[in-house]
Amino acid sequence: MWGLVLLGYVLFVIEWFVIDFIRGSAASLLTEQTSAVPQYGGWFSSFFVADAGFIPGQATNWTITLLRAVGSILCGVMVVKFGYRHAVMIMMGLMCVCFPFLIIGSPLGGHNELTLLRPASSEVISKLTKISSSLQQGQLLGPVQVGSQTMLADGTPVSLIKGINGNEIGTSASMTGYAFFIIFRSTIAIGGTTLIAYAQPIIASLSSNRKKSILSNANFWGFNVGLVIVAAPFLIPGVGRFATANWVWVVTFMILLVFAMLLVFAWFEKKVDHMLPQKQSKTNQSLSVRPSALSILKRKTTWKLLAIAGVGTILLINPLTQTWFNSLLAISGAKKAIIPTARPILLILWVMGYLLGYFLLSPFNKTIYDKKRWLHFIFTANAVLVLLIVIFAATLGLNTVVGFTFVGIFTFIAGGFGWSLGSSILILPYEYKEYKRNEVSIIFGYVWGFAYVFYSIFDIITSVFLDAPRIATGNTSANILPGAIAAIVLFVSLLLVINWVIIYLPSSWIKNGDECVSEMTKKWRITQWQFLIANKAKNRYADLLK
């Protein structure tokens, strides 16, 4: 059952990153001087003739991330309102109702008024003198500019809207289409994000704290495996070109997979629904204590947990972003990395670092050590590793074999520490005295929801930092090094400052259901790594395990 929910989350991650990878490029504005027949692919060419700039591009991600936050916060309330089974099915269904964005983003043979591509008329073809002999009447083309006149390929006159960077980016109709495209795409994000929170009530129903630790740690496999499945094939240029050219069919296939997953879950979950949180009717509300979402949010421990989860989420997501990669390029003084696939390779190394963390660091979560010192160690180690990545990028550069190799190695190591930190944070609600099992779905809804809010704020600030030199000078090719340095300093500072919050965390407890058995008072020292070989009752370190 836990595996089904996690598989649904894996499908979400795959679908989400596939849509990002098959984005394609802008349609570009055709003129009399255009010397090559354009090749259109991906959904971006349906709406834009030029890039709108870094900040507007990031603003789309901010909007979607904030919507994911809202969905995550509400997911716990939905369990109380509809019961676990129906709450999960609603969110899987929400992922499926995104399908209108396929229609909105497809040119539909040039008949979609919300896109820029139109069947070329003979009159327009004759004006594109350098490529007219290579064009056919009815061929899909983007907007054309002849002199001061701008028109669609079918001859319809249009006016282009300027973006924040001064570029003419599209028509009012295509911008409207893009807005609808993002709205329906957001349903994938809202529905998919909540599934990782819905894996937690299943874990909470387990009697063994050790099993809870193992499955909480394994939850991250969903994201990491999904990203690797997407990124690895795109290292082959032919795969990327094919997927981008056929993006509608690729995404349609993904939506059908999610729908199939919904049907499988509905069939299987019906057999075990009685074991999980049920809808709170007036009758059973009077027989049991109903968890209050507001009362949980008012607790000081909740906000401490949210702060730590927020910084942890920033740590996990930031190295996956274009902002981080651009920052590394800026401090290395290079316009581009040594190989075109540098960013996908670093993405894969970061998420594959989870393997290192899973076997080397995450076993700590199964011990009876107090978690505070461990959290101090992991956050501080991550700050040091991030600084090492920055130092290697600045001194050796991303445009050299040696520099990229060292950045890649330490990205993998930092990923191990980062993902193990995530699993350490997720185990905390199960060990805190004041949280009960029937509150788990609400708590993790808050954890994921507010974590995305904190990350969105961080992403907005760092994106503004990075683009500030260009905006201030009005020069789109201005050096972004000052902004990159500011973004890196903020990133490292958060990893260090959060140690102050950790000091005030409550103690962890060994629990049997909601019963607190014993407080975890054993203090961990950096020289104590016996938990790596402890295996229940088979050796002298078994007392370290729960």
UniProtKB/Swiss-Prot annotation:
<keyword id="KW-0812">Transmembrane</keyword>
<feature type="transmembrane region" description="Helical">
    <location>
        <begin position="88"/>
        <end position="108"/>
    </location>
</feature>
<dbReference type="Pfam" id="PF07672">
    <property type="entry name" value="MFS_Mycoplasma"/>
</dbReference>
<keyword id="KW-1133">Transmembrane helix</keyword>
<dbReference type="InterPro" id="IPR036259">
    <property type="entry name" value="MFS_trans_sf"/>
</dbReference>
<feature type="transmembrane region" description="Helical">
    <location>
        <begin position="485"/>
        <end position="505"/>
    </location>
</feature>
<keyword id="KW-0472">Membrane</keyword>
<feature type="transmembrane region" description="Helical">
    <location>
        <begin position="305"/>
        <end position="325"/>
    </location>
</feature>
<feature type="transmembrane region" description="Helical">
    <location>
        <begin position="442"/>
        <end position="462"/>
    </location>
</feature>
<feature type="transmembrane region" description="Helical">
    <location>
        <begin position="220"/>
        <end position="240"/>
    </location>
</feature>
<comment type="similarity">
    <text>Belongs to the major facilitator superfamily.</text>
</comment>
<protein>
    <recommendedName>
        <fullName>Major facilitator superfamily transporter MPN_077</fullName>
    </recommendedName>
</protein>
<feature type="transmembrane region" description="Helical">
    <location>
        <begin position="401"/>
        <end position="421"/>
    </location>
</feature>
<dbReference type="InterPro" id="IPR011699">
    <property type="entry name" value="MFS_Mycoplasma"/>
</dbReference>
<feature type="transmembrane region" description="Helical">
    <location>
        <begin position="377"/>
        <end position="397"/>
    </location>
</feature>
<feature type="transmembrane region" description="Helical">
    <location>
        <begin position="2"/>
        <end position="22"/>
    </location>
</feature>
<dbReference type="GO" id="GO:0005886">
    <property type="term" value="C:plasma membrane"/>
</dbReference>
<feature type="transmembrane region" description="Helical">
    <location>
        <begin position="248"/>
        <end position="268"/>
    </location>
</feature>
<keyword id="KW-1003">Cell membrane</keyword>
<feature type="transmembrane region" description="Helical">
    <location>
        <begin position="344"/>
        <end position="364"/>
    </location>
</feature>
<feature type="transmembrane region" description="Helical">
    <location>
        <begin position="62"/>
        <end position="82"/>
    </location>
</feature>
<keyword id="KW-0813">Transport</keyword>
<feature type="transmembrane region" description="Helical">
    <location>
        <begin position="179"/>
        <end position="199"/>
    </location>
</feature>
